[in-house]
Swiss-Prot record:
It comes from the Bacteria. It comes from Exiguobacterium sp. (strain ATCC BAA-1283 / AT1b). This is Aspartyl/glutamyl-tRNA(Asn/Gln) amidotransferase subunit C. Allows the formation of correctly charged Asn-tRNA(Asn) or Gln-tRNA(Gln) through the transamidation of misacylated Asp-tRNA(Asn) or Glu-tRNA(Gln) in organisms which lack either or both of asparaginyl-tRNA or glutaminyl-tRNA synthetases. The reaction takes place in the presence of glutamine and ATP through an activated phospho-Asp-tRNA(Asn) or phospho-Glu-tRNA(Gln). Heterotrimer of A, B and C subunits. Keywords: ATP-binding, Ligase, Nucleotide-binding, Protein biosynthesis. One of its GO terms (molecular function) is asparaginyl-tRNA synthase (glutamine-hydrolyzing) activity. Belongs to the GatC family. The keyword ATP-binding applies. One of its GO terms (biological process) is glutaminyl-tRNAGln biosynthesis via transamidation. Pfam families: GatC (PF02686). Its EC number is 6.3.5.-. PANTHER family: GLUTAMYL-TRNA(GLN) AMIDOTRANSFERASE SUBUNIT C, MITOCHONDRIAL (PTHR15004:SF0).
Length: 96
């Protein structure tokens, strides 16, 4: 039987930068345990002869040729950008 611990719920919440209460930790622990137990039922299925699949639907990417289209002049982009460095728009860091 799959069981997720409160420590694991707190860890995942921390990774997601979520502040959760003790009550929420208990609630999510119970919910996630039920979800894992439900998913374990798939182990009981006989999948002999069933081809592995990566997608539920047989979709294909539709590719097209690249085409050059008019865009803003570089000078206008530079004028509008809050920060510009070495010919590129400088943005705040996403990762620490």
């Amino acid at each position: 039987m799959a069981r997720i611990t409160e420590a694991e719920v707190r860890h995942v919440a921390g990774l997601a930068r979520l502040a959760i209460t003790d009550e929420e930790v208990t609630h999510f622990t119970e919910q996630l345990t039920k979800i894992l137990e439900f998913a374990e039922q798939l182990d009981e299925l006989d999948t002999t002869g069933v081809e592995p699949t990566t997608h539920a639907l047989d979709l294909k990417n539709v590719l097209r040729k690249d085409e050059v289209r008019p865009s803003l002049p570089r000078e206008e982009v530079e004028r509008m950008a809050p920060d510009w460095e070495n010919g590129q728009v400088r943005v705040p860091a996403v990762f620490e």
